[in-house]
């Protein structure tokens, strides 16, 4: 029986589907430049640069004003509220610079996490209050997609059934509100890499989480063709002593997705989860070469793993513009190649690209 109360019109569905497919077309992925003021401050502190709005603006200007050919690698950029309204040195809005390159503009809309009482320090996501109005304003101001991040951890009795169900339902509710306002939802249920668990444990938990998320999305009448998934790769915990190859990570990851993610979803854009730039690229490449059916585009939505080398090259100095932009373009191209299974590892002498970017209990 046809749904008695359709959530979206055929025109709304068409627009959402086209935007989602455009973001992940032909090896394109997402630059996650939605770090909060505090998180960006931590990054700047490591290169001994003061955390001021101007310094944050200057670094992001370098990323957004690279050669237009970046649009062959980057299909979308997720911005933080501050960044959506910032301008380059000539007074042009960043969002307009990106749109002129053919890059879709997105926005982070969750408001962080809050404790779930009665659990082992588990959390749920904040930000549903007033979300529809904020979505409408961001859509008016040029955003066409948005991100909502839920955090689940592997620990003693974690993630609990309550945490999985609560976060799945919150992700689904947000996705529905986004779509009602013409924004493609980037659904991000992150099983964080904190801990000493092995890869098999992570796969088990990831499958349980994704199954719950897609059940909730169905319950909330979310149009899957107009969404993208931003999951963790299936990896061992950061403190696990056993090491796994990219091929092992790929097989576990694609198996988990194959068991839980409907083929209607146009694209899966992995988060980097604190991996080094090079490891994030190698794992993505192996995932695309994995000999299992892959009905979705398998791409990237990286923050640290696209920016670490560029940030190190910049060092807060205007004269390092060329080196900064070259470092960013190099990583963007490498990940675009990996999204097509065409990346060739040549060995890296760049310490920034091979350095672990892991931060315990990482928050945006």
Curated annotation (Swiss-Prot):
Xref: PROSITE patterns: ALDOLASE_CLASS_I (PS00158)
Residues that bear Phosphoserine: 36, 132, 272, 276, 299, 301, 309
Broad class of where this protein is predominantly found: cytoplasm
Keyword presence, Nucleotide-binding: no
Compartments, as annotated in UniProt: Cytoplasm, Cytosol; Cytoplasm, Cytoskeleton, Microtubule organizing center, Centrosome, Centriolar satellite
Superkingdom, taxonomy of origin: Eukaryota
CDD domains in alphabetical order: FBP_aldolase_I_a
CC terms in the record's Gene Ontology section: centriolar satellite; cytosol
Positions bearing N-acetylalanine: 2
Binding-site residues, beta-D-fructose 1,6-bisphosphate: 43, 272-274, 304
Reactions catalysed: beta-D-fructose 1,6-bisphosphate = D-glyceraldehyde 3-phosphate + dihydroxyacetone phosphate; beta-D-fructose 1-phosphate = D-glyceraldehyde + dihydroxyacetone phosphate
Residue numbers annotated as active site: 188 (proton acceptor), 230 (schiff-base intermediate with dihydroxyacetone-p)
Site, as annotated: Necessary for preference for fructose 1,6-bisphosphate over fructose 1-phosphate: 364
Assembly description: Homotetramer. Interacts with BBS1, BBS2, BBS4 and BBS7. Forms a ternary complex with G6PD and TP53; this interaction is direct.
Family recorded in the similarity comment: Belongs to the class I fructose-bisphosphate aldolase family.
Leftover remarks: In vertebrates, 3 forms of this ubiquitous glycolytic enzyme are found, aldolase A in muscle, aldolase B in liver and aldolase C in brain.
Name the UniProt record assigns to this protein: Fructose-bisphosphate aldolase B
Name of the encoding gene: ALDOB
């Amino acid at each position: 029986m046809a749904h008695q109360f359709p959530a979206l019109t055929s025109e709304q569905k068409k627009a959402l589907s086209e935007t989602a497919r455009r973001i992940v077309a032909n090896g394109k992925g997402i630059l996650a430049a939605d770090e909060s003021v505090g998180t960006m401050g931590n990054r700047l502190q490591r290169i001994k640069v003061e955390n001021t709005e101007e310094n944050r603006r200057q670094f992001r200007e370098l990323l957004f004003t690279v050669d237009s050919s970046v649009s062959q690698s980057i299909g979308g950029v997720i911005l933080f509220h501050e960044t959506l309204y910032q301008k380059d040195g000539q007074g042009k809005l960043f969002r307009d610079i990106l749109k002129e390159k053919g890059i879709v503009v997105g926005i982070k809309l969750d408001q962080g996490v809050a404790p779930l009482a009665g659990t082992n320090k588990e959390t749920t996501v904040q930000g549903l209050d007033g979300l529809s109005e904020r979505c409408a304003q961001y859509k008016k101001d040029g955003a066409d997609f948005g991100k909502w991040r839920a955090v689940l951890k592997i620990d003693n009795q974690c993630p609990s059934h309550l945490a999985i169900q609560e976060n799945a339902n919150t992700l689904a509710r947000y996705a529905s509100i986004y779509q009602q306002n013409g924004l493609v939802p980037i659904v991000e249920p992150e099983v964080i890499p904190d801990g000493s668990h092995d890869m098999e444990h992570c796969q088990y938990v990831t499958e349980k989480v994704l199954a719950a998320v897609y059940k909730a999305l169905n319950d909330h009448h979310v149009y899957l063709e107009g969404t993208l998934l931003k999951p963790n790769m299936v990896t061992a915990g950061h403190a696990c002593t056993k090491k796994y190859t990219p091929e092992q990570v790929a097989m576990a990851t694609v198996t988990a997705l194959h068991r839980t993610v409907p083929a209607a979803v146009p694209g899966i854009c992995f988060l980097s989860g604190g991996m080094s730039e090079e490891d994030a690229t190698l794992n993505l490449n192996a995932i695309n070469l994995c000999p299992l059916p892959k009905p979705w585009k398998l791409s990237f939505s990286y923050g640290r793993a696209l920016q670490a080398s560029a940030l190190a090259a910049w060092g807060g100095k205007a004269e390092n513009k060329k080196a900064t932009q070259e470092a960013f373009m190099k990583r963007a191209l490498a990940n675009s190649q990996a999204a097509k299974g065409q990346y060739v590892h040549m060995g890296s002498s760049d310490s920034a690209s091979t350095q672990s970017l892991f931060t315990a209990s990482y928050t945006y």
